[in-house]
Swiss-Prot record:
Miscellaneous information on this protein: Present with 2990 molecules/cell in log phase SD medium.
Protein name, UniProt field: Cruciform DNA-recognizing protein 1
Spans annotated as Disordered: 107-227, 247-276, 300-465
UniProt keywords, alphabetically: DNA-binding, Phosphoprotein
Species this chain originates from: Saccharomyces cerevisiae (strain ATCC 204508 / S288c)
Annotated InterPro entries: AMPK1_CBM, CRP1_MDG1_kinase, Ig-like_fold, Ig_E-set
Gene it is expressed from: CRP1
Gene Ontology cellular component annotations, sorted alphabetically: cell periphery; cytoplasm; nucleotide-activated protein kinase complex; nucleus
Length: 465
């Protein structure tokens, strides 16, 4: 048997420093055992102390915030060369006995964990009195609760009996639900079980080990029953990516130039087979062109048809018969009037040409069946000269037209109830009246019928015919 002696001893240091470390002969003065700071602020640690003999001592020292120092609460010993250490003897260790039933905490440096030793002697009378009072209060509360519960249970039983009498059942058939009637669970003997044994679920050895549990470990690998029949497991091919891309790109580029000329040749071959346009198609185009030219003139005249014609002003009535009588005018004014007359004659000539074209189109393009008519012979020079030299005939026709016009205007004046003329008509009359006076005395006799035919009233006569 070994002669070593071992005791548990608690080393302490008062509160104040941040870190306290214990070192000594047990660790060859390396400073490896730090003290634990308690709730009070002091530092403590409990550790086993070994002694070889009864006369042997345990030498130690404290390192407080990096400074080696000795505690005054322990015995001191002077070593050679002026070094001072704390030490413990066997008598100091025997006084501190270990608590029965306590266990050590290795994380806390060997501190004890257990109930403190109970002090000898009887307990105090004050504690007994307090315990008795508390017990009496608890009993009284329990009695009150029990009486309330009994009353409620009796009332509920009476109600149940009344209901049973109505429905034909008794309370004997009903099972009790109170705590007293519930059976207790059978106690299990824990001592019979071995400390190291655990409950393990039974394993079905007949199941295939290849199949995996889908609930715990997921779906797992799939094992095919016939892997030899699947091509993907046996066939392996090595494909060069560059060669494959070059081959595919060449195939895509080849059809582009070939597809172009084939389409063009088919179009060029089929183009002469199209039917040529007939003559009536060309004529319809010309008619549409002429209609577009006449539309602005028709739009300018339509508002005059809808509106009732006002009574002619006295200025207009006087200017029409007196157009032939022109007084001599000075040279400067006469030149200006001649220029204006030429500009108006150009406009009137253009309107005549448009009207002649419209008449020709109406005569040529009709829906009636075409009959071969004798072509009109062109007029000779003599006939044209006779037409020009007979202004008297044209004057007689104009007088008849004026008389008819006067009768129509009188009828319209009665219906219109003396309505005033619009601003547009007054402007047209005032502008066109001096045009007839600007004619020179030499050419007045020959050009009077042309002006009257193309005047404002001449257009109105054509529309009312």
């Amino acid at each position: 048997m070994s002669s070593e002696l071992m005791f548990n001893y608690t080393f302490s240091w008062p509160a104040g420093p941040k870190d306290v470390i214990l070192t000594g002969t047990f660790d060859d003065w390396r400073g490896t055992l730090p003290l634990v700071k308690t709730a009070k602020g002091n530092f403590e640690i409990t550790m086993p102390v070994k002694l070889a003999n009864k006369d042997d001592t345990f030498q130690f020292k404290f390192i407080v915030d990096g400074v080696w120092c000795v505690s005054d609460s322990y015995k001191k010993e002077h070593v050679s060369e002026g070094i001072e250490n704390n030490f413990l003897q066997i008598t100091d260790l025997v006084e501190t006995q270990e608590v029965a039933g306590a266990s050590r905490i290795p994380e806390a440096g060997g501190l004890l964990c257990g109930k403190p030793p109970r002090s000898a002697g009887p307990p105090s009378t004050s504690n007994r009195k307090k315990n008795k009072r508390n017990n009496k209060k608890r009993r009284s509360k329990l009695k009150k609760k029990s009486t309330k519960n009994n009353k409620k249970s009796n009332e509920s039983l009476d109600d149940n009996e009344e209901e049973d009498g109505v429905t034909g059942t008794t309370t004997e058939d009903v099972t009790g639900t109170s705590r007293e009637e519930t059976p207790l669970a059978e106690p299990t003997n824990v001592s019979k079980e071995a400390p190291g044994n655990f409950h393990i679920l039974p394993i079905d050895q007949s199941a295939d080990t290849t199949q995996s549990n889908g609930i715990i470990g997921g779906p797992g690998p799939v094992l095919v029953p016939n892997p030899g029949e699947i091509k993907e497991f046996t066939e392996i091919r090595d494909v060069d990516a560059r060669e494959l891309n070059e081959r595919l790109n060449k195939k895509e580029e080849v059809p582009e130039p070939v597809a172009g000329p084939i389409v063009e040749s088919s179009v060029t071959e089929k183009s002469p087979a199209l039917p040529q346009a007939d003559d009536p198609i060309v004529e319809t185009k010309e008619v549409a062109h002429n209609v577009q030219e006449l539309t602005p003139q028709v739009e300018a005249v339509t508002p005059l048809i809808n509106e009732p014609e006002p009574l002619p002003t006295p200025e207009a009535q006087i200017s029409i018969p007196e157009s032939s009588k022109v007084e001599p005018v000075e040279g400067s004014l006469q030149s200006k009037l001649v220029e204006k007359r030429e500009s108006t004659e150009g406009v009137l000539d253009g309107s005549k040409k448009v009207e002649n074209k419209a008449k020709k189109d109406e005569e040529v393009f009709t829906l009636d069946p075409i009959v071969n008519k004798a072509p009109k012979l062109p007029l000779t020079d003599e006939q044209t000269a006779e037409g020009r030299k007979s202004p008297a005939v044209s004057e007689e026709k104009e007088k008849k037209k004026k008389q008819e016009k006067g009768s129509k205007e009188v009828k319209r004046s009665e219906t219109s109830k003396e309505k005033k003329p619009s601003a547009k008509e007054v402007k047209k009359q005032t502008v066109k009246a001096p045009k007839k006076q600007t004619a020179s005395p030499l050419s007045s006799s020959t050009e009077e019928p042309k002006k009257k035919k193309t005047g404002f009233f001449g257009k109105l006569k054509k529309l009312f015919k």
